[in-house]
């Protein structure tokens, strides 16, 4: 049929109107479905440069956040803050012993709701890296492997062992099939772009020889055979079999990583440790943000395109989930602290780094790399596309003590000691790893007024058994005895002493000697408490030895073996042993009496209070509680009630006056505490213990404590609210202005404003405002946030200037230059290079 041109135009118009009408008639749900269907599936591939998502090369900034270490109520805010910190990916382990604590019985609810966690990440527009295990280490009890696995006949963990492979394959398929059913893989339109099987296997591979290599090949084939449409990695595994990508773990992968084992694989950094995990008995340990930023900039300057901060938020080892001797608080010095609060300047300085690297994105992903070495201490690495304006440079000064000058393309740059300056156009410095522009915060633990009202502690003391029926001829190994059902295992034995044994010898009383493989031990003889002993994370074995008074006839020895978690690393974990190994009486008239193999031993697992569940409301009435006298022996349960701390700030309990034990709030396990194990500085490693708000009710919250040690003072315990309302700035007058002043447009770096200058930015959290300026000095002040002092040079008007810019505001910006702080245009110390130190207090408006 032939159509005239006028008719043709009319027909096109009619069709267009119909289509528009149809589109307008779609429901909002239909529109959403239509939008989602457009970009539903994502193809993830890779080459020697980067991961490629839907045909687009990506720079990936990832952070480790472990779902069981925070509560579902905390997840949204933590993920949101991670995104605001410049991350585009979240990495998590999958915890086998969380999901399958009993063989064949899976749990994916509450803090174990992996699907919910991943969907929240997806909702925030972030990618996911799923580190599947089966072994994860992670300072988590048993490295994430369930206890029951130890009791599978003929099993050897993490090697070419059929029972282990059989259970691993079953577990892996349960998890991956669940992810697939929920359409969470990128190939299905979900957020999971990368997977990991096994973890740092090279650390144990030599112990298993050929079986170790066979196991790694088997693990690789297992996940690739499931055809999930994502790449897979193995970290610290340089011989990772194709197509597996070998990735780096460590603090300085830009210098320590030998690179991918094939040219067609990208350089990925799966763990950049943001601090050092803590164990009981440790002094404080930190890693500076300057060092982290330096390491990341160096890695990206040397072909790296993916970094993961381990941890970005550490969280809490609730209940008994920490590995041996590891504190309840985990990676608290990460960019988001244990409570999910932004730890500044670590959070902000890394955010600025991500901004700077994004300005370099085109050059890093498509440019040709070049390297120049002006001196032994300096290095220039740059990427450019010939014939275009695309160019980015990294000027590195590796001198740890002094600044160095670097001449690049006709211009001289002064680079501070051990730092890297980033030039996203090969001309303009927008960021230096050693110059912190972001604000600082100091964390405050404020005693709660509501929660600390007249504690009325009641107590229940465990009976110490003198004789448990049993026929073992040696003390049973403690891991196998407790089976991860309790931290505690009782051991009893009896022995006879005659008059000849008690005859006086030079050297005084006989000595009881107990050699233990760990972790801690309490000892009674004939009902009298003799004391306790313990090992450490570095040296688990210890000896308990003490002079004792024996009686003629039968004597009764009772020992309580104590665990602080299962081991989380090493080869042959299924054969790792702990607990008392040899027991003897030295100095008897007849010589040494060996009780280890010549006596029958009785054993019992756990406390009566654990068996009855008296840590929760429904179990309280199963025992008789008495009013606390203040002279309780060890092995005592304490309970009281308290109201929730005021405000919605994070909450914690401070365990002053206590020794060692476990804490529950409303039946929820807060974790292990150990106040009596002091660091070399003479202080407990951890004092405050996080109580998530979701554990609390407005009133009458049940606090239950099991305390191992005698003579404690529970009246010294208090509840605190946690904030970061102390906000500071510490900026040198010659620092590089914030990267936020810059953007990239048409392959060029351009200033967002006409006036690019250095400023100090202070910001309160939430709806709070700056209520006081506690310190201000433009000169050469000393100290850190929360502890500043004046130096020899100080502009007298410093505090007045800061108050003018900041008081009563939620956020303020202070110009950092001489003209702002000069009085009558006079510089009282012109030869001093100035720094501005400011400390303010944030608070809520009293009217509110």
From Swiss-Prot:
Active-site residues, record numbering mapped to chain: 200 (proton donor), 271 (nucleophile)
Species per Swiss-Prot/TrEMBL record: Arabidopsis thaliana (Mouse-ear cress)
Secretion signal, residue range per the UniProt entry: 1-27
GO molecular-function terms, A-Z: beta-galactosidase activity; carbohydrate binding
Subcellular localization: Secreted, Extracellular space, Apoplast
Listed name of the protein: Beta-galactosidase 13
Keyword entries, A-Z: Apoplast, Glycoprotein, Glycosidase, Hydrolase, Secreted, Signal
Listed GO biological process terms: carbohydrate metabolic process
Domain SUEL-type lectin: 754-843
Primary subcellular site in the record, as a coarse category: secreted
């Amino acid at each position: 049929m032939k159509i005239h041109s006028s008719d043709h135009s009319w027909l096109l118009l009619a069709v267009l109107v119909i289509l528009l009408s149809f589109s307008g008639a779609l429901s909002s749900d239909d529109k959403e479905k239509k939008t989602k269907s457009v970009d539903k599936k994502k193809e993830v591939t890779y080459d020697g440069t980067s991961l490629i998502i839907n045909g687009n090369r990506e720079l990936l900034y990832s952070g480790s956040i472990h779902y069981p270490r925070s509560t579902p109520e905390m997840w949204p805010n933590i993920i949101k803050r991670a995104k605001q910190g410049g991350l585009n990916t979240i990495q998590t382990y999958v915890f086998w012993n969380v999901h399958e604590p009993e063989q064949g019985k899976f749990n994916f609810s509450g803090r174990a709701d992996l699907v919910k966690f991943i969907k929240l990440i997806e909702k925030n527009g972030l990618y996911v890296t799923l580190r599947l295990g089966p072994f994860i280490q992670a300072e988590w009890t048993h490295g994430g492997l369930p206890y029951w696995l130890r009791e599978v006949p003929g099993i050897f963990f993490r090697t070419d062992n059929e029972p282990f492979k059989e259970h691993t394959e079953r577990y892996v398929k349960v998890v991956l099939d669940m992810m697939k059913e929920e359409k969470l893989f990128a190939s299905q339109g979900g957020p999971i772009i990368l997977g990991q099987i096994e973890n740092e296997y090279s650390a144990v591979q030599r112990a298993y020889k050929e079986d170790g290599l066979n196991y790694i090949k088997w693990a690789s084939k297992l996940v690739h055979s499931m055809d999930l449409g994502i790449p897979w990695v193995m970290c610290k595994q340089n011989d990772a079999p194709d197509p597996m990508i070998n990735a780096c773990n460590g603090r300085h992968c830009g210098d320590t990583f030998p690179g991918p084992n094939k040219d067609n694989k990208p350089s990925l950094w799966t763990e950049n440790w943001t601090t050092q995990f803590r164990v009981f008995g440790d002094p404080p340990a930190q890693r500076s943000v300057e060092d982290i930023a330096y390491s990341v900039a160096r890695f990206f300057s040397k072909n790296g395109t993916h970094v993961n901060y381990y941890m970005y938020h550490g969280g809490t080892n609730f209940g008994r989930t920490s590995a041996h001797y590891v504190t309840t608080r985990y990676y608290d010095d990460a960019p988001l602290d244990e409570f999910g609060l932004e730890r500044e300047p670590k959070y902000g300085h890394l955010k600025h780094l991500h901004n700077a690297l994004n300005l370099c994105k085109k050059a890093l992903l498509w440019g040709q790399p070049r390297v120049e070495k002006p001196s032994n201490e300096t290095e220039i690495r740059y990427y450019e596309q010939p014939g275009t304006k695309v160019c980015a440079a990294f000027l590195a000064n590796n001198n740890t003590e002094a600044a160095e000058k670097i001449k690049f393309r006709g211009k001289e740059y002064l680079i501070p000691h051990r730092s890297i300056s980033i030039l996203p156009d090969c001309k303009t410095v927008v960021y230096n790893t050693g110059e912190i522009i972001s604000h600082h915060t100091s964390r405050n633990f404020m005693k709660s007024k509501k929660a600390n009202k007249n504690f009325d502690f009641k107590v229940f003391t465990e009976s110490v058994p003198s004789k448990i029926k049993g026929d073992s001829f040696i003390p049973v190994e403690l891991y196998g005895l407790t089976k991860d059902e309790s931290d505690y295992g009782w051991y009893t034995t009896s022995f006879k002493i005659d008059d000849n044994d008690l005859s006086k010898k030079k050297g005084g009383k006989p000595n009881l000697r107990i050699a233990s493989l760990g972790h801690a031990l309490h000892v009674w003889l004939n009902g009298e408490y003799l004391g306790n002993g313990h090992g450490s994370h570095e040296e688990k074995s210890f000896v308990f030895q003490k002079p004792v008074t024996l009686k003629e006839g039968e004597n009764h020895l009772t020992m309580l073996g104590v665990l602080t978690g299962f081991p989380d690393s090493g080869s042959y974990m299924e054969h790792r042993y702990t607990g008392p190994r040899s027991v003897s009486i030295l100095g008897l008239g007849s010589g040494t009496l060996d009780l280890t193999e010549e006596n029958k031993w009785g054993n019992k697992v756990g406390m009566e209070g654990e068996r009855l569940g008296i840590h929760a409301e429904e179990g309280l009435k199963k025992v008789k509680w008495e009013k606390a006298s203040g002279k309780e022996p060890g092995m005592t349960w304490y309970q009281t009630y308290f109201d929730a701390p005021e405000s919605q700030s994070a909450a914690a309990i401070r365990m002053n006056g206590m020794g060692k034990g476990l804490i529950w709030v409303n039946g929820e396990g807060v974790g292990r505490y150990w106040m009596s194990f002091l660091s070399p500085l003479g202080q407990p490693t951890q004092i405050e213990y996080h109580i998530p708000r979701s554990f609390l009710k407005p009133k009458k919250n049940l606090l239950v404590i099991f305390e191992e040690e005698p003579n404690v003072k529970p009246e010294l315990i208090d509840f605190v609210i946690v904030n970061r309302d102390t906000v500071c700035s510490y900026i040198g007058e010659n620092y590089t202005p914030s990267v936020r002043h810059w953007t990239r447009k048409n392959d060029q770096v351009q200033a967002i404003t006409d006036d690019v200058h250095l400023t100090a930015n202070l910001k309160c959290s939430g709806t709070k405002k700056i209520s006081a300026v506690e310190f201000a000095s433009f000169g050469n002040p000393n100290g850190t946030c929360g502890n500043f002092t004046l130096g020899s040079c100080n502009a007298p008007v410093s505090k007045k200037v800061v108050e003018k810019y900041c008081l009563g505001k939620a956020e303020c910006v202070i110009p950092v230059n001489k003209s702002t702080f000069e009085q009558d245009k006079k510089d009282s110390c012109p030869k001093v290079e100035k720094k501005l130190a400011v400390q303010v207090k944030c608070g809520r408006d009293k009217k509110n």
